[in-house]
Amino acid sequence: MAEEKSYKYVIIGGGVAGGYAAREFSNQGLKPGELAIISKEPVPPFERPELTKVYIDLEVNPTLANIYVCAGTGEAKQYPNWYKEKGIDLIVGTEIVKADLASKTLVSDDGKIYKYQTLLIATGSTNIRLSEIGVQEADVKNIFYLREIEDSDELALAMELYVQRGKAVIIGGGFLGLEISSALRANNHEVTMVFPEPWLVHRFFTAEIASFYESYYANKGIKIIKGTVATGFSTNSDGEVTEVKLEDGRTLEANIVVAGVGARPATSLFKGQLEEEKGGIKTDGFFKTSVPDVYALGDVATFPMKMYGGTRRVEHADNARKSAAQAVKAIKAGEEGKTIPDYDYLPYFYSRFFKLSWEFYGENVGESVLFGDNDPKSPKPKFGTYWVKDGKVVGVFLEGGTQEEHKAIAKVARAQPSVESLDVLSEEGLSFATKFYSTSL
């Protein structure tokens, strides 16, 4: 007979959302043996964004312990013994292969059965593979996708192997492409980025913002090829990649390829059991799903946007952390016959690479207004962009800002103050946000 365990709460997924949900349960009050985290990854929850940043910096040579949650918010790191001390069963290296939400039963890949009273789905996303978008010979050696800790470990080994002679091609011009390119270049690899869009981070950056980063990267020796895609690869006798074939007929030498062509939420386990929307699991403002006692967090959740109306699915660590806290607070409040406010999320994105660091709050819709020093040759560039819709500032981007300035732009994005004109806003620049922030304290 299969081994069976029962818990009051079960979290499926050991990523950012799972780790921060565990922290919130601990903060709210948790009895030993009430909570289990079941994760297919072999390690405790860690800050996944760091896989493309500090974790592959060979000069820093960090360990996994450096990036355990809750390092991303400056709180104490949750080492393996933290879960033991809190009475949380951390079950790693175990994948749930069957979920019957009607009977509140989960079955793992090793045949064990887990029963729960309340389930939190924090399964995150899976990378889209090159073969899924029609790229030929995409299963050769030294093509990397960064999602799990093993991915970054393997890339770091390849970076060490090819140090001083590395030729890396990054397929994709999004956030991951920017971060990985800088890490490889900082570790003395020749780097080429390839993507089909007309500029970097096309869905998010304006052409003016992208122009700065493209020039900055060019000054660092990174080559950028736009408007084409990879179609296949050449290999040596060991099956290792040697060339990337492009649609425009060019070939690029490469002994390392990193693909960042998108991701999809990992929801297949629950198909036909939960209501879905916009590619994710539909939830309310407390991250409750269409099935009682089942919650969805982070990347997999499509939730109501209180500020803007409608619903949205957000793939970002910030939302993973905050949605986890919201769900756990809602669960505990419900047990006590209390209520909490609906989730009121302000979209937030950030990135850092080389000596640059930017943050964005709000929405990138409407007319854009550039301000500040966006000279890529500047020793300390500092610039930003406001987005104005219907006479109100609805989004703000800032490169090179301070902590206080980031608070200011966040305040502006949430309050959405009116502006006299775009010209006046451009002239005021960052001072518009800092003045608004100081007067609202």
From Swiss-Prot:
Residue numbers of Phosphoserine PTMs: S418
One cellular component (GO) term of this entry: cytosol
Entries under InterPro entries matching the protein: FAD-oxidoreductase/Apoptosis (IPR050446), FAD/NAD-bd_sf (IPR036188), FAD/NAD-binding_dom (IPR023753), FAD/NAD-linked_Rdtase_dimer_sf (IPR016156), MDHAR3-like_C (IPR048618)
Residues engaged in binding NADP(+): F175, L176, G177, L178, E179, R203, G262, E315, H316, Y350
Catalytic reaction annotation: 2 monodehydro-L-ascorbate radical + NADH + H(+) = 2 L-ascorbate + NAD(+)
GO molecular function: monodehydroascorbate reductase (NADH) activity
EC annotation from Swiss-Prot or TrEMBL: 1.6.5.4
Knockout or disruption consequences: Loss of growth and seed production promotion by Piriformospora indica.
A Pfam family recorded for this sequence: MDHAR3-like_C
Single biological process term from Gene Ontology: response to water deprivation
This protein's UniProt keywords: Cytoplasm, FAD, Flavoprotein, NAD, NADP, Oxidoreductase, Phosphoprotein, Redox-active center
Function: Catalyzes the conversion of monodehydroascorbate to ascorbate, oxidizing NADH in the process. Required for producing sufficient ascorbate to maintain the interaction between Piriformospora indica and Arabidopsis in a mutualistic state.
Protein name: Monodehydroascorbate reductase 3
Record organism: Arabidopsis thaliana
